[in-house]
Amino acid sequence: MVRSVFALVFAAVLLGGCASVPSSSAPQAIGTVERPAPSNLPKPIPGMDPDVLLREFLKATADPANRHLAARQFLTQSASNAWDDAGSALLIDHVVFVETRGAERVSATMRADILGSLSDMGVFETAEGELPDPGPIELVKTSGGWRIDRLPNGVFLDWQQFQSTYKRNTLYFADPTGKTVVPDPRYVAVSDHDQLATELVSKLLAGPRPEMAHSVRNLLAPPLRLRGPVTRADGGKSGIGKGYGGARIDLEKLSTTDSHSRQLLAAQIIWTLARADIRGPYVINADGAPLDDRFAEGWTTSDVAATDPGVADGAGAGLHALVGGSLVALDGQRITTVEGAFGRMGDQTGAALSRTGRLVASVVTLRRGAPDVAASLWIGELGAEAVQAADGHNLSRPSWSLDDAVWVVVDTNNVLRAIQEPASGQPARIPVDSTAVSSRFPGAITDLQLSRDGTRAAMVIDGRVILSSVEQTQAGQFALTYPRRLGFGLGTSVVSLSWRTGDDIVVTRNDVGHPVSYVNLDGVNSDAPARGLQIPLFAIAANPSTVYVAGPQGVMMYSASSAEGQQSWAEVPGLMVTGAAPVLPG
């Protein structure tokens, strides 16, 4: 049941971009902003049965404004004074109240399924399991009807009301290299479109979610702040970001002076607003002057296109594949063995092009399945020679970061980076600290892929999808931190994975009915079409437009632009060869 609920939610995310699902609240933390309550929230009415009143109270907690004022209408004054609504909210469904009734007082205990949590920053994460007993709830009869007189601290939020009240939006922060922006999805309970821009910029100023604080850069960090609410480009207060009205953002206390940093600052704002359907031009001022004199009349997404989070890496490189253990390029319906080492070497079992499409990392595995199996990692330019960068009994499929380092897992639990030394030209092997991952999820890492911005790593551990942040320490070393599980509905069926976008992972599974599924950063999973696929699927590669999988009949593809009536996988001409595996930048 949980999987079907999440599947419906995630389908809405894919189709709508800004789906009618979870989203956060106020410009600072949830509940601190004063604004009118959404019109769809219930209110207590005389004659309301205690069970109904409790359920309506859970719905009213969906509005965090004014310290959950809408929900406090269901409480006595003493209960409202005592109730601590700070911190994260638990999202619950299938709620059952077990009541002991008296003429003037009702005592109730609550049972429910946990579907997720919503932090005070608006960060939603899926979860599963039964709600531990939160403690008794007491109701008393008053002159205005039944009211809650005692309740546990914390917020329990009705799942259905959550979906109808909150909207998913994405904040963007800069990656450490300054080449692109990184998604940070949030859930926002703002029904007035003209308030949304102020809400989102305020959240940018408040910073990234805690687990990304050391993985991204925020060019809008303090002391920078908003001088006032976001308006239309001409200063008007209605129609913000609609039509040609644009948006005007007035900042103050700017400390960023160099042009590139100001460009990144603008990119964070522009992509955050543009992805929320708040259209430009974007007039961005700082301390009473244009952020950049070149764009005094307003910025557009074209002005920050170099950081576009939706662009496919190395798109010009095209699709490659491993066929018969060697790397080939697909030219129309013909395959051509690439020149150089990667075309000559046999026994290649996993490969990836660099983010630019100019370099290749490939794993060669000898004596597969034998006790003395041996694997080695080779790195080089596409069409040229290669150097050995690592070895072991087995190596995971390689993955490239934005700084042209190759990440690989050696012998199922040793994560390392291989990067070319500028002086010698030889690759250096640098261990990655994965203690946080192995401590919480101690199984074998059978696949590891970096997100396109390089700030997150998705792994397959014991058939589950595990996400972690990528942090660089002050000493220059790298670590995988804050691991958490995604896609509880996938069980332990996951075989391999690939990042489709910075917010969306696609996985292959050993599930006959659902061999390919999606899961996003929130942990919400949904199933891709299965028609036309045969299992087992042993490899996957994806970009924003197309997903490629390797199965018994060869390489199959599914396009995001497929018509709704054509929900089936298509053969990739030239790659319908047993054992062929797709290779893309990533």
Curated annotation (Swiss-Prot):
Residues carrying lipid (N-palmitoyl cysteine): C18
UniProt membrane topology term: Lipid-anchor
Family: Belongs to the LpqB lipoprotein family.
Name under which the protein is recorded: Lipoprotein LpqB
SMART domains documented for this protein: Germane (SM00909)
Lipid linkage positions (S-diacylglycerol cysteine): C18
Organism: Mycobacterium ulcerans (strain Agy99)
Region (Disordered): 26-45
